[in-house]
Amino acid sequence: MFFKNEEEAFKRKPEIIIELEKEVKIKPVEEKVVPETKEEIEIPKPSEFRESKYNSTLTKNLFTNVDKARTRDGFGEALVKLGEINDKIVALGSDLAHSVRAMWFAQKFPERFFQIGIAEANMTGIAAGLARVGKIPFMSTFGVFITGRNWDQVRMSIAYPNMNVKLCASHTGVFSVGEDGASHQSLEDIALMRILPNMTVIVPCDKLETYKATFAAAEVKGPVYLRFGRENVPVITTEETPFEVGKAEIFRDGDDVTIIACGPLVYDALIASQKLEEEGIDARVINNHTVKPIDRDTILKAARETGLIVTAEEHQIHGGMGSAVAEVLIQSYPVPIKMVGVKDKFGESGSPDELQRAYQLTSNDIIKAVNEVMKKE
């Protein structure tokens, strides 16, 4: 049995739990708006800013006072908009709808939102059933729960029958749930999802791209894994920045080396390219938002034109986006490659900044990888 809203679910819970949840977690949807902050990023000022090297559709304040916003907000806003224009859109939550922003949809379309409770496998089966009768279900929870805890159900109920279900994962990677530690940090989810036949895997880089990716996921005929986070991250794209499933975007042109990144590390890759420019290294930066199906043409073109590849992701280096890039290269055009990512470790508790440094996921670590791969040339 499932509930159409959290209020109905409360009636089934012990009184003490109801009171605790009201105090700790459940907030009115009107409080959803999180003001975007402007924080100056400390980066070296380049001796010459060669604007022509950068994608003209990126924000103009890329390196000074860049706007920040939560990628999960882009998902929540897009889901509401989709609900307005398509009555086949339905949403399912597993007791974390407020945290992942699915509650915004629930507030506007309560009859099309299903609160399943802490039962991800049940949510998956229900979503598959809704898809079977023509609905377009968006099921959402934390990344570690929707993938690892729930993998067999996703495999058999969604991927195997090729159900048109969208798996929307918030609080992914190292940064989003830093203080919660290893149990909540989904560092293996890209690998788990991209190995499944029929599954599309999308990892947008900022709030605006997450908004576009949510719309794009609705257009894909089949299962989609959409990965986003909790923390404020720089908004580097604009409304004019193209987004197409399976088509990577070149954010900076360059001839010496290519940095291929996804998710929040796309911004760090751009910062690294600025610092490398001061060292006389001309780095191409590619936003590889679609891990599957991967854009083989753009990757191989970069390999042929620059001869060196560095990948950067907030995920295990084994089985993640870097592995997907390496698979393309080894089959068609092998070149030296270096991967920046979590190196076969579980997560730890700490602030996002502390963990980014501890797991060597900063722009300086990308620069180090570039220098190492250039020595192999």
Question: Where do the model's predicted regions map?
Answer:
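Thiamine diphosphate
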Residues: 1-227, 232, ...
